Amino acid sequence: MATPIRPLSYSLRRQSNGESRRLSTRVTSVTVCSVRYSVLSFLNTTTVRWKRFVPVV
């Protein structure tokens, strides 16, 4: 019983590795998008603050 289970587990591991790679690529793309969005929002807030701060001074 142990011999036929090994190749099945190996094939499942290969499939899981492929799925994990796809998920990792998706996660990396999502993280990059979120980082870009956060950076853009931060720059927008800083520009607004500078625009508010400059006329006061």
UniProtKB/Swiss-Prot annotation:
A matching Pfam family: DUF5466
Official protein name in the record: Protein 19.3
Source species of the chain: Escherichia phage T7
